[in-house]
Amino acid sequence: MPRRGRVPRRAVLADPLYGNTKVTKLINQVMLDGKKSLAQRICYDAFEIIKNKTGKDPVEVFEQALKNVMPVLEVKARRVGGANYQVPVEVRPERRQTLGIRWLVNYARARSGKSMQEKLAAELIDAANNTGGAVKKREDTHKMAEANKAFAHYRW
């Protein structure tokens, strides 16, 4: 146990174009090798594509996509008497958002062909419509938690 107090979380600054902290977190997740300006360009171009394809506000589409992807439950491995159990636990709000953004970006990267802007835009639109890889990942996570409900009493 650390003897010092808890380390405070750094506040995430709102992004310059939309003034939204969730968009900043998306940009940071897209960023590779510290190339933030490139990540910003990718995200903003993806938002332009979303605006052109759907005719809706891209930030609203992103927030809806994030809401559809954020998991409520997940499983954690817990060792009890020589056996490993997958114990379902609730996901804290901060982690919920982080996982949602991470899954959106990872499944956008995994899409074939095209530029990252188009892949990210397509994944966000799909997630907003409750389809796509990231939504499937959330469903699988919930299914795992449901299947292991019997071990819920091992929670800590």
UniProtKB/Swiss-Prot annotation:
Keyword Ribonucleoprotein attached: yes
Keywords assigned by UniProt, alphabetized: Ribonucleoprotein, Ribosomal protein, RNA-binding, rRNA-binding, tRNA-binding
GO biological process, one term: translation
Record InterPro entries: Ribosomal_uS7 (IPR000235), Ribosomal_uS7_bac/org-type (IPR005717), Ribosomal_uS7_dom (IPR023798), Ribosomal_uS7_dom_sf (IPR036823)
Pfam family, one: Ribosomal_S7
The keyword tRNA-binding appears for this protein: yes
MF-aspect GO terms: rRNA binding; structural constituent of ribosome; tRNA binding
GO cellular component, one term: small ribosomal subunit
Subunit details: Part of the 30S ribosomal subunit. Contacts proteins S9 and S11.
PANTHER family xref list: RIBOSOMAL PROTEIN S7 (PTHR11205)
Chain's role: One of the primary rRNA binding proteins, it binds directly to 16S rRNA where it nucleates assembly of the head domain of the 30S subunit. Is located at the subunit interface close to the decoding center, probably blocks exit of the E-site tRNA.
Family: Belongs to the universal ribosomal protein uS7 family.
Protein name per the record: Small ribosomal subunit protein uS7
Native organism: Moorella thermoacetica (strain ATCC 39073 / JCM 9320)
